[in-house]
Amino acid sequence: MKIVLAGGSGFLGSALSRALRRDGQDVTVLTRSPAPTTTSDPRLSFVPWTPDGTVGTWASAVNGADIVVNLAGESIAASRWSAAQKDKLRESRILATRSLTSAIRQAARPPAAFVSGSAVGYYGDRGDETLTETSPPGTDFLAELAKD
């Protein structure tokens, strides 16, 4: 399978990339960093992208992919949550998702699946309450960020 992974250099993305490649999948990581020109793993490639809400040349990686996984976004733990940092967290997730969904809509051969991660923060801190997928969202910043 050909899998495109946005956010593939982050905490979850790098672990997912390793696991997928161990299972024999080909992984293309969309990266904001300068893309390495070579890699020791033939199942791994890098494509530079700018997740700014638009579609760029990177979208050719999406065309013909089997699955696109979106784990992109500014690190929650990178710094204190000032108003500016909260805006950066929100914008990085919304624009990355907008870029990917636009590329998928424009693809001649769109992927069969699009998986976009949010977070357990969706439920908020409920103490000892047992939560299920049908539990309502929380009301704190992380819950609002996941809903956005």
Q: Regions from the language model: what does each represent?
A:
Residues 2, 66-67, 113:
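Structural motif
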Residues 3-23:
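N-terminal Rossmann NAD(P)H-binding glycine-rich loop of SDR-like oxidoreductase domains
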Residues 6, 30, 71-72, 114-120:
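SDR active-site strand-loop-helix element
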Residues 27:
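Short beta-strand element of Class I
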Residues 30-36:
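Short, polar loop motifs at secondary-structure junctions
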Residues 36, 43-96:
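NAD(P)H-binding glycine-rich loop region in Rossmannoid oxidoreductase-like domains
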Residues 86-88, 98-140:
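Conserved Rossmann-fold NAD(P)-dependent oxidoreductase catalytic core, especially the SDR/UDP-sugar
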Residues 139-148:
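Active-site Tyr-X1-5-Lys
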